[in-house]
A protein has these predicted regions:
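Solvent-exposed loop/turn segments at secondary-structure junctions
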Residues: 75-79, 95-98, 119, 133-137, ...
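Extracellular S/T/G-rich loop segment that most often corresponds to the catalytic His/Ser-adjacent loop
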Residues: 74, 212-283, 287
């Protein structure tokens, strides 16, 4: 985790351990380093990814992400830091969460990679910044976070659906995931059906982190980390969910506890780079579907012949190729539906969601869902909070 404690690495594995004990715990995935300097100003020259990807040239051509809405689920974003001055950020606090400066530093840093006027990848996007609860890093939620059924307002399923409810087109999650949530399957099914792109950090355990990664699910863009030497970073985790890679640091950000500018590296920071580039692609290719943009990401990856491996996916991201290759030539099909070794939701499960026949008690905070199945007990189930129209699913009327 990035934060005030520079000598201690917070592992994403903390998430699995605490979540298994019945608490929401999401390990924030980045690695701290020593303080860089105490100056207030952070510039593009301080950020390894900015020059590496030639983002000044993208800006010169007008590619800023204008008109695109990104959401992030992370620590609370402090919009008062100088690097976020003028950025279009709406901070969303779902309930009362007791947190720490280190978690807020992480969220604020991730936001700055996305939208900083000085060094943001997509400085003109509209950013919805949702505060989550990261129990593995000491966060605690108050009773107003609780919901019937046990999936609270501070949980990932709830917040991912909040972002889609609010119109997010791309969602950044620089954190690991307690995958015991069965609701995550239907969150990702919704994202696939509605063509919302989910982007997730692979982790920093230098191991196969599928068990604590949202990116193990179909449709999700898992991001590992490379260095400016183009090599995969030793800390970067891997697995079937990895789709691409980008520069993971060193990244300069404000430590909100000390006020100093510090540095860190990790897939927490490689992930918003990918999210930002996808926002640039949405602006550059407004007629393309999100499925076609994912096809573009896969087909421009820098692995030889765009082949897949568990370390860098289809290869490191190539923003230049993405902004210069028309995705309309690619099929309007999600290329991440069946990940290596199999993944869920399947196409049939996505169709079940779209047809409204998924058990509504397995779905949380989804303002687009209507149950259209045949189970009459749903009419009386107190946990079913969705409109219910029995027998009206399109699957019952297709010829």
């Amino acid at each position: 985790m990035v934060g005030a404690t520079k000598s201690k690495r917070m592992h994403a594995r903390n998430a699995a351990a605490v979540a298994a004990a019945g608490a929401l715990a999401v390990g924030i995935v980045s690695i701290p380093a020593a303080p860089a300097h105490a100056a207030d100003t952070i510039t593009a020259t301080d950020q390894a990814y900015f020059g590496y990807y030639g983002l000044d040239r993208a800006r010169a051509k007008g590619y800023t992400g204008k008109g695109v809405t990104i959401a992030m689920i992370d620590g609370k974003v402090d919009t008062s830091v100088p690097e976020l001055a003028g950025a279009n950020i709406t901070v969303k606090i779902p309930c009362t969460i007791t947190t720490s400066p280190s978690v807020e530093s992480h969220g604020t840093g991730v936001a700055s990679i996305l939208v900083s006027a000085d060094y943001g990848v997509a400085p003109k996007v509209s950013l919805l910044a949702y505060q989550g609860r990261f129990g593995g890093n000491g966060d605690r939620g108050a009773s107003d976070c609780d919901q019937p059924g046990g999936v609270g307002k501070d949980s990932q399923p709830w917040l991912l659906n909040s972002a889609m409810n609010d119109g997010a087109q791309i969602i950044n999650l620089s954190a690991s995931t307690p995958n015991e949530y069965k609701e995550l399957k239907w969150v990702t099914a919704r994202a696939i059906a509605q063509q919302v792109i989910l982007v997730n950090a692979a982790g920093n355990d230098s191991t196969n982190d599928d068990d604590t990664s949202l990116s193990k699910w179909s449709g999700v863009v898992g991001v590992s980390a490379i260095g400016v030497d183009d090599n995969r970073q030793n800390y970067s985790s891997w697995g079937q969910g990895v789709v691409t890679a980008s520069i993971g640091g060193p990244f300069s950000f404000h430590d909100l506890a000390s006020g100093e500018v510090t540095q860190g590296s990790g897939t927490s920071f490689s992930t918003p780079v990918v999210t930002g580039v996808l926002a640039l692609a949405k602006q550059r290719w407004p007629e393309a579907t999100s499925n076609q943009l994912l096809q573009l990401l896969v087909k421009t990856g820098l692995n030889p012949d765009h082949g897949w491996n568990q370390y860098t996916g289809f290869g490191a991201i190539d923003p230049g190729a993405i902004l210069n290759t028309d995705p309309s030539q690619f099929p309007d099909e999600n290329p991440l539906m069946e990940k290596q070794g199999g993944s869920s939701p399947t196409l049939e499960e996505v169709q079940q969601y779209a047809d409204g026949v998924v058990d509504p008690t397995d779905i949380v905070n989804d303002n687009s869902y209507t149950y259209r199945g045949l189970d009459e007990s749903m009419l009386e189930d107190s946990l079913n909070v969705y409109p219910t129209h029995l027998g009206t699913s399109p699957r019952y009327h297709r010829k």
